[in-house]
Amino acid sequence: MRASGILMPISSLPSAHGIGAMGAEARRFVEFLSKAGQAYWQILPICPTSYGDSPYQSFSTFAGNPYFIDLDELAKRGLLLPEEYENIDWESAPDTINYGALYEKRYKVLRCAANRLLAKPNAAYRKFVKENAFWLPDYALFMALKDAHSGACWLEWEEPLRRREPEALKAAREQYADDVAFWQVVQYLFYAQWNALKGYANRMKIDIIGDLPIYVALDSVDVWSCPQEFQLDENLLPTEVAGCPPDGFSATGQLWGNPLFDWDAMAKTGYAWWVRRIRHMCSIYDVVRIDHFRGFAGYYAIPYGDKTAEHGRWREGPGYALFAAIKKKLGSPRIIAEDLGFLTEDVNALLKECGYPGMKVLEFAFDSRDGGDYRPHSYPTNCVAYTGTHDNEPVQGWFATADKTDTDRAVEYLNLTKKEGYHWGMMRGVWASTADLAVVQAQDVLGLGHESRMNTPSTLGGNWCWRALPGAFTPALAQKLNHLMELYGRLPAEAAPEDATQDPADSPSV
């Protein structure tokens, strides 16, 4: 069935408290999607961010980002007083995010809420801790230890803690019991709000497309707690790290620095770690977009310590064996495969065997540096078409920065006009395509330019900061989108029920 959606990170929602959150503005955006004839809300990873603020470099693949906890919602439930957060200066303009200010000020507010909840722990909290015992205790201890070590990477901790010696872990849990409890409560508060928001979206007939990074960060509880799942040496350092080879976009390639999975070791357990990971993602999202799908067919391995990706080499990935194990344990989860970048026959064969929809990016169709065919007339139906992703310029930014030969090709192919706006013409291109699902960036819907770009790969600073202004998603804009969805056969068959916009009533009590 033809459908459409909008890519809008949680962090980019309007907010009076420094960053987008899972409260009233999130529900308003869901209502906008429904009125605009959309069926999907695609987001970026919602895991905690670390240095550099990238959601693709997280302290945990299972935890939620504490910054996304809506403070007004906590106040409604008696966990915060207005004076504890309403007058805080988050040191950012309404259309951007200051992560340094968030780090310095947000956790102090959350500790106020956590202390009130811990004074009277309720059944819902105890149930959450029990149900998430497969990751929560390790995560909470990891974060408490990071606090105790002034944020230092776990590789710099004392040897008994680095190697997770049982006596050292037991002593740490006792010594830092209050901090461990705080980090557990924060995750309870996050998932209470997330589950309420997702339930609200689903009642409005909006499915959530979540994002799963293929790799995890070296400084993460995932590597610290499960070193046997990764390619590490006797000192627990990576032997090689992840990245991408040099290409037309980068002469030195991309050095991501993530540790690589030990696929041989994982195979011996039936890929149990990955099954747990996918099961969790399917429990919090309706659809899971797996980043860098080509890494499952073959992955690029760069010697640890190298400054660029120039001297890496290709290694064989797990192939279909991983997805067969997932299917055996979980059935057929709804997965989108991010199959962009350097593609080879083994990648195409794996995608075909899995049956997952791949991705097509319209901006790539006119980029003379890209050898793939991303023109809409060549799209298969089983794919997701995008104007661009979080790693691309918004359409207006692309026209301002791309080579004129490329932009002229786009104008000719799509018959774009300045009167309508190039961004509307490009969005029409993906909506009119044969792709089952078309997703456009929120920045394109709003007609924004380079200033709203979410991320520029291989750069540090200035990324992940864009926020929409309050009131940007107007009723008139929703009406225009709804008309275009009808025009291109992407309007959902069933509208949301009349009472779906009521304030969520099934949120766990906090």
Q: Model-derived features: where do they sit?
A:
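Surface-exposed amphipathic alpha-helices with a cationic face
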Residues: 34, 194-202, 327, 351-352
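Catalytic domains of carbohydrate-active enzymes, especially glycoside hydrolases
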Residues: 24-49, 284-285, 430
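Outer-envelope exported proteins of Gram-negative bacteria
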Residues: 44, 207-209, 213, 287, ...
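Long, low-complexity, intrinsically disordered segments
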Residues: 500-510
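Conserved, well-ordered alpha-helix/loop/beta-strand core segments that scaffold catalytic motifs
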Residues: 183-216
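N-terminal regions that are enriched for targeting/export leaders
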Residues: 1-11, 27
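Structured C-terminal cap/extension of enzyme domains
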Residues: 447-499
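Alpha-amylase-like alpha-glycosidases and glucanotransferases acting on alpha-linked glucans and related
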Residues: 9, 15, 53-191, 216-439, ...
